[in-house]
A protein has these predicted regions:
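N-terminal cationic and glycine-rich segments that engage phosphates or anionic surfaces
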Residues: 1-101, 105-461
């Protein structure tokens, strides 16, 4: 294994990409220590410590712990992700954008440019909401007023635009997906703080006699979740494909059997990130309007752990799982390419029948993948922050009030132990290793796994 790691640095291009990625990640972490002017960072951090199991803790997870200190990178990559989702949705429902996307590299560059503009607009709106919320807070702002609001908007919007640039540079000139790696870096850096928090709870017997069992249960659940994530992320449905024999000159070509691999979770962590970014935006914008008689109830209902939020989060994950697959995989193109090269699925007529068959299988396994993402995302979060079933209206709420307090309020530990964070860390790590392995195999080196880079342990569904 050590030799395979040294192979990375024997390839100049791969070595350059990895070092470039690490350098930009270091810049990202450095920016996380530059505070936004005019904010009492100590009071703000104390407030986050008191609300670590709430929605604020969840949002802070995606900013890499920078929201609690309100650094220049406090918005993280959420504005960029939200802008990307909006543009991708518009390409489906708005015909001129769909035509622009099909124009090739020039069209994609135009859409990317519009995504950047929309990112800046969303960052300005979110930073305005944060500034208003801070002014209404408990002495967080040193000098309230229009000057503080404008300075906060300028600082956070500029920081968000710079993060967007960092992510694009990593994707283009580094290794892995830049945006995912930025989230990954923020979560990994915060893990020691989560471990220290868990140790403090154990030392102070935070949950009374239930403390040892709660910690043991949390550790066991984390191990099981990591194993489950690795298992499902490596799982695929293999559709058998047969190629007919063809005579080319004096040679007989084709005739071999192969398969078409369809990943159970083709979207990876993106559906979870997309759904999270969409649902966090109303909270960040509306944080300063919680006492408003028109929007207060809606903002409260959209709070973390509330039944409405839970329902919308689950629906969002399912929607974006299908939406992402529809973008990255086109059954009609796959079927057409198979037909051109003489390939067919045994028992299925080439052409439209083949496309329909692939689409049917893809629909089923995507649902399995979406349900897997929901399970991974929700079960640990219920343990950490609880699910407020007692807030349901009428008799349902009264019935669920009988549940133990830790079920409705959670254990109150850090979100770094949640399913969403584990899913992102494991998923991004596996995707990055796969890209590095592909670079090694392409240059005739063995990958990290035996048999010349062939990944063992694949599971079929």
């Amino acid at each position: 294994m050590l030799e395979k790691f040294t192979n990375i640095f024997r390839i100049p291009d791969l070595r350059k990409r990895i070092l470039f990625t690490l350098a930009l990640l270091a810049v990202y972490r450095l920016g996380g220590h530059i505070p936004t002017p005019g904010v009492d960072a100590n009071k703000l951090q104390q407030f986050f410590e008191q609300n670590r199991g709430s929605f604020l803790g969840f949002v802070d997870l995606f900013s890499g712990g920078q929201l609690r200190r309100l650094t220049i990178f406090a918005l993280g990559i959420m504005p960029y992700i939200t802008a990307s989702i909006i543009l991708q949705l518009l390409t489906v429902v708005y015909e001129p954008l769909a035509k622009l996307q099909k124009e090739g590299e020039l069209g994609r560059k135009k859409i990317t440019q519009w995504t950047r503009y929309l990112t800046v607009m969303l960052s300005a709106v979110q930073s305005f909401g944060i500034a208003i919320s801070l002014e209404k807070g408990q002495g967080f702002v040193l000098n309230p007023g229009i000057g503080f609001i404008l300075m906060t908007m300028l600082t956070l919007t500029t920081g968000s635009a710079f993060i967007m640039w960092l992510g694009e540079q990593i994707t283009d000139r580094g290794i892995g997906n830049g945006m995912s790696l930025l989230i990954f870096a923020g979560i990994v850096v915060g893990l020691p703080r989560g471990v220290a928090d868990l140790y403090d709870k154990a030392a102070t017997q935070a949950w009374g006699p239930f403390t040892p069992f709660a910690i043991l249960m949390l550790i066991v659940v984390m191990i099981v979740i990591v194993a489950f994530i690795v298992y499902v992320e490596r799982s695929e449905r293999r559709i058998p494909v047969q190629y007919a024999k063809r005579v080319v000159g004096r040679k007989v070509m084709g005739g071999q059997s192969t398969h078409l691999p369809l990943r159970v979770n083709a979207g990876g962590v993106m559906p979870v990130i997309f759904a999270s970014s969409i649902l966090t935006m109303p909270q960040m914008i509306g944080a300063g309007f919680k006492n408003n008689r028109y929007f207060g109830n809606l903002i409260h209902a959209m709070g973390w752990g509330e039944p409405l939020y839970t329902l919308l989060y689950a629906v969002g994950i399912i929607f974006f799982a299908y939406f992402y697959v529809s973008i990255v995989f086109n059954p009609n193109e796959v079927a057409d390419n198979m037909r051109k090269y003489g390939g067919f699925i045994p028992g299925i007529r080439p052409g439209k029948r083949t496309a329909d068959n692939i689409n049917e299988i893809l629909t089923r396994i995507t649902l399995v993948g979406a349900l897997y993402l929901i399970i991974i995302s929700f079960i640990p979060e219920w343990m950490i922050a609880g699910i407020h079933l007692n807030h349901l209206p009428g008799a349902l709420g009264t019935f669920f009030e009988r549940l133990p307090t830790w079920v409705t309020n959670g254990l109150g530990v850090s979100f770094y132990f949640g399913g969403t964070s584990l899913l992102i860390v494991v998923g991004v790590a596996m995707d990055t290793v796969t890209q590095v392995e592909a670079q090694l195999i392409m240059r005739h080196y063995d990958g990290f796994t035996p048999r010349s880079g062939r990944i063992r342990g694949r599971r079929t569904w």
